[in-house]
């Protein structure tokens, strides 16, 4: 979230410990918004993949020694002056290469083909006709068949480089898929990584298995063992302090670190008063009693709610919560040191791979985009601590898989995403303890109804929102004037886009009745049917 100073250099960029132990695929990023999906699809095949911007691809290739390379899509045109390009050293290295969209165009041009501007952009669903066989299509597409794909391009390949043949075409792309079987170079004008290309995952699997010959040995069990060794090597006999938010990321990180170094870890759980119902009790029970991990539980709700009184701007809410979290966390760390346990040299946090992937700016050079965490941002600088980030190579779904590998209860591992500022951004307008109590109860009833209906695991995220308005109602023989609760539920694969979940009317009616009957202060319930875009998943 926001309240952070810059992330220290020790966390600026991936540093895979899997590099020496497993086969790897290097993904060269040309700025596509869906490059992360390529990495996820490859990892689903049990092969470690890493994304680097094209400017750093040559150095990364030498360091990683990958068994294959994928060139991503991107917004640029190969016809532009100083257009991004793949290092020729990679194209001459003898490893399989797959080009996707812009990756196809730059591969074709760099190897002697011709790319021209199209008469019109081709964006959205398109039909591919397979004109010849190749390793990518084996067992997936047949010669002469027509298949749906997702296109997003303006330029197109019009002349093949030597050694290539066209194996598929589309209406706007006469050369839609190309193959050089001898060099194991393949490229496609469409995006196989997105769900809108139904057979895309199978095509990528063929590149991994049949073209690159990789079997897939990167598992969460292997990651767990390697991460434990890495933590022990980094920490030695030092002490680690970990800020728990109650979410999956920080919890999995803490349990993994505790498995590595035991009592050298102390966790600090700051309850800011904006958690879900019984969340504080659940965290304390899990860490103190189930895992026997040293835990300091701080109820700072009075302090947080006092500072938030009168604050209505959502960004100011985030900044206030982030600033206070740092203050409280730092104070507790000093108390731990004063008790004779010694000052912690290391700060653990649940940074994930999307937080550290370097993005590319084609006008201003490379820029590192690292998500600031509302709960620990700025602490390493202020407290002179080194970072321990055992999850920084993983995507969210991989963190959940690691949690299961570590034995976390499914009801905890499979929880829907929850924002760092908590219910503060699900309560538009000013926050009060009364409003939070109402929202907490309404949310609990809603989630309980979803679980009873067997829908929880089918939904990406579901929650209640307490609207800053009251409406007139009738309950019994009396008039009421109480709050409105909004219900939100979405389906998504990655959180970047989302559709509202289509509950049936019976479920919505029963849930609304339960909330109104069980939660004092609510007399009306509405359902949010906005997708993302144009809306966001959270209301603030």
UniProtKB/Swiss-Prot annotation:
CDD domains: GATase1_GMP_Synthase (cd01742), GMP_synthase_C (cd01997)
Gene Ontology CC terms: cytosol
InterPro entries registered for this protein in UniProt: Class_I_gatase-like, GATASE, GMP_synth_C, GMP_synth_GATase, GMP_synthase, GMPS_ATP_PPase_dom, NAD/GMP_synthase, Rossmann-like_a/b/a_fold
Claim: Nuclease is one of the keywords in the record: no
Origin: domain of life: Bacteria
Alphabetically ordered keywords of this record: ATP-binding, Glutamine amidotransferase, GMP biosynthesis, Ligase, Nucleotide-binding, Purine biosynthesis
Known pathway: Purine metabolism; GMP biosynthesis; GMP from XMP (L-Gln route): step 1/1
Catalytic site positions: 101 (nucleophile), 191, 193
Disulfide bonds: none
Domain Glutamine amidotransferase type-1 stretches: 24-217
Broad EC category: ligase
Domain GMPS ATP-PPase: 218-415
Pfam families recorded: GATase, GMP_synt_C, NAD_synthase
Gene Ontology molecular function: ATP binding; GMP synthase activity
Task of the protein: Catalyzes the synthesis of GMP from XMP.
Family annotation (PANTHER family): GMP SYNTHASE [GLUTAMINE-HYDROLYZING], GMP SYNTHASE-RELATED
Oligomeric and partner information: Homodimer.
Protein's name according to its UniProt entry: GMP synthase [glutamine-hydrolyzing]
């Amino acid at each position: 979230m926001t309240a952070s100073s810059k992330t220290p250099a020790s966390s600026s960029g991936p540093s895979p410990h899997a590099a020496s132990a497993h086969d790897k695929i290097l993904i060269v990023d040309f700025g596509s918004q869906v490059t992360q999906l390529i990495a996820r699809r490859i990892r689903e095949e049990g092969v470690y993949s890493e994304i680097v911007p094209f400017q750093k691809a040559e150095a990364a290739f030498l360091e990683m020694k990958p068994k294959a390379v994928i060139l991503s899509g991107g917004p640029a045109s190969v016809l532009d002056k100083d257009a991004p390009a793949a290092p020729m050293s990679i194209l001459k290295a003898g490893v399989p290469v797959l080009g996707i969209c812009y990756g196809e165009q730059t591969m074709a041009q760099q190897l002697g083909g011709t790319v021209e501007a199209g008469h019109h952009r081709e964006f959205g669903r398109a039909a591919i006709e397979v004109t010849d066989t190749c390793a990518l299509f084996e067992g997936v597409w047949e010669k002469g068949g027509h298949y749906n794909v997702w296109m997003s391009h303006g330029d197109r390949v019009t002349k093949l480089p030597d050694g290539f043949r066209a194996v598929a075409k589309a209406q706007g792309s006469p050369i839609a898929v190309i193959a050089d079987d001898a060099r194991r170079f393949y490229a496609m004008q469409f995006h196989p990584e997105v769900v809108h290309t139904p057979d895309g995952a199978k095509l990528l699997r063929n590149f991994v298995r049949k073209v690159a010959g990789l079997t897939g040995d990167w598992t969460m069990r292997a990651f767990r063992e390697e991460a434990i060794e890495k933590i022990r090597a980094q920490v030695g006999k030092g002490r680690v302090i970990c800020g728990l938010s109650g979410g999956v990321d920080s919890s999995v990180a803490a349990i993994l670190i505790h498995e590595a170094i035991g009592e050298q870890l102390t966790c600090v759980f700051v309850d800011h008063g904006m958690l879900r119902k019984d969340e504080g009790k659940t965290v304390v029970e899990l860490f103190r009693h189930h895992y026997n991990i040293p835990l300091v539980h701080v109820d700072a709700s009075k302090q947080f709610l006092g500072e938030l009184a009168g604050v209505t701007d959502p960004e100011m809410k985030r900044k206030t919560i982030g600033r206070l979290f740092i203050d409280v966390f730092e104070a507790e760390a000093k108390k731990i040191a004063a008790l004779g346990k010694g000052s912690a040299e290391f700060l653990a946090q649940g940074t994930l791979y999307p937080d550290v992937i370097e993005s590319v700016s084609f006008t201003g050079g490379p820029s590192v985009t690292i998500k600031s965490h509302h709960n620990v941002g700025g602490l390493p600088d202020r407290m002179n601590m080194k970072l321990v980030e055992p999850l920084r190579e993983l995507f969210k779904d991989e963190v959940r898989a690691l949690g299961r590998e570590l034995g976390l209860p499914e009801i905890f591992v499979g929880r829907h995403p929850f924002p760092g500022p908590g219910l503060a951004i699900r309560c538009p307008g000013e926050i009060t303890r009364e409003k939070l109590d109402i929202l907490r109860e309404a949310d609990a009833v809603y989630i309980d109804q979803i679980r009873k209906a067997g829908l929880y695991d089918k939904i990406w995220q579901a929650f209640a929102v307490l609207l800053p308005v009251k409406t007139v109602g009738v309950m019994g023989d009396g008039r009421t004037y109480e709050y409105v609760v909004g219900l939100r539920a979405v389906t998504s694969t990655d959180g970047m886009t989302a559709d509202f979940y289509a509950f049936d009317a019976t479920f919505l009616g029963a849930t609304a009745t339960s909330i109104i009957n069980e939660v004092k202060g609510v007399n009306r319930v509405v359902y949010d049917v906005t997708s993302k875009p144009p809306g966001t998943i959270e209301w603030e």
